Amino acid sequence: ICTRLIDDISDIVSSDAYTQEYLSERLANAGLLPMFGFPTRVRNLYLKDPQDQGKLPSEDVVSRDIDMAINSFAPGHEIVKDKKVFKSIGVVDYEYNKLNHTIRPKSKSLNVYTQPLCRCKSCGYSTVVDANPQIECPVCGNEMEHIKICSPLGFFVDYEKTPEDFNGDYDWYSPNSDVRLDCEQYLSEYSTVHNMTIRNNQSPSQGRVHLVNDNMGDFYCLGRDNKGRYISRAALEEPKSQTIVLQNEAKYAFVASKTTGVLTLSVDKVPESICLSPIFEQNVNSFAVRAAFLSWGYLVRKAIASYMDIDSSELNVGYY
């Protein structure tokens, strides 16, 4: 606190990684203040156009934490509200223009990261770098793929389409976000416990974690319409998907980033007869290894939640 606090605050204020306007909210999202009382990670799915209603906040919305929203509200996904089925078609958030007292889409609704997500398909290593994207994976040496990423500020449905009645059947999508750690250099190793290596970060502000929804590898192709909204053609019906004019269409993965406490567990010494490599070329059972580690992680999560008397949903599990 005495030596780094002022510099840390200055770095957070000048960083493009945070979208919050108020200092306390931004510091809370960066892990320097507790998140209690700050609903800044909530994202809305707009069911009606606030510009037509003439007021904010809009009442015709469905709200989710961003960790859930990047899946549930992603373009093409359907949700049910008041016995009606709504389909998300793109990304938008709104703001009040004090100059002419109107409501308009935010210019940065898509919230594109200036740096790409560098990800290795072979071993799963990933990082969001500030400059000089990595070409080779530092873990396995294979080529890294560079992915455009964004953290949408809101989502919306086709306002011109009448929602269908819910008859018990709709397109449900299972969550497909992967948990990606981006704090390797800040993890401290502790004494081995029963052949288990334990590492964690000493400060929550050092624990950068990304939840990534890449649409099962197909990404989300979004372009900007003449109203400043970002729309996915694939989520629209014919013939609108072909006739709509969109600018600067590009593919993105959705990311929800946060700073938090991180705990990693691994096996210290492995018998030569057992291969735990996550790389398929080295281990044909790599998918089974991943499943086993994830099962272990969920078991540990359940034990921690029971011991601390918290909801298990407050803890995320990933294979890294």
Short names for language-model regions:
Residues 118-123, 137-140:
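Short cysteine-rich clusters marking metal-coordination/redox-active sites
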Residues 1-96, 130-320:
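Extended, highly charged accessory segments
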Residues 66-72, 102-117, 124-132:
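Short, flexible, mixed-charge glycine/proline-rich loop motifs
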